[in-house]
Amino acid sequence: MAGHPKEKVIPDEVHQNQILRELYLKELRTQKLYTQYHVNPLRKIHTVTRKPMSWHDNLEEPADARFLNLIHHAAQGPRKKYPETQTENQEVGWDLEPLINPERHDRRLNHFRVCSDITLYKAKTWGLGDDHHK
């Protein structure tokens, strides 16, 4: 019962034509024609050195201002390129201003090293080493 072979239905030409038409329309939807090519400025490229004795490579070519601007823009850091952070990791260290005013004379936040007689004595004994002070 489980192995009953089903009769194979032979599709007619209209059905075959409809399948081919759907495939053709799907290909046309996904195709994209590229007419303008340029180098990706975000990817590092290897320069190809020219042959020093060839005459056609030694001709001076005008500099492409648009391409140079793209290269210079890609070489900048993210803080110079964008006004705001683009990723979560850029948020760390984006703002360089301190959150509070660093007043050096405020004793609540600045705990400087205070030296007294006991601390000076202990610092000198630690400076001599363990073998001298035994």
Curated annotation (Swiss-Prot):
GO terms for biological process: flagellated sperm motility. One of its GO terms (cellular component) is sperm flagellum. GO terms for molecular function: microtubule binding. The keyword DNA damage does not apply. Keywords: Cell projection, Cilium, Cytoplasm, Cytoskeleton, Flagellum. It holds the Pfam family FAM183. Residues 76-95 are annotated as: Disordered. It is found in: Cytoplasm, Cytoskeleton, Cilium axoneme; Cytoplasm, Cytoskeleton, Flagellum axoneme. Microtubule inner protein component of sperm flagellar doublet microtubules. Microtubule inner protein (MIP) part of the dynein-decorated doublet microtubules (DMTs) in cilia axoneme, which is required for motile cilia beating. Belongs to the CFAP144 family. This is Cilia- and flagella-associated protein 144. It comes from Homo sapiens.
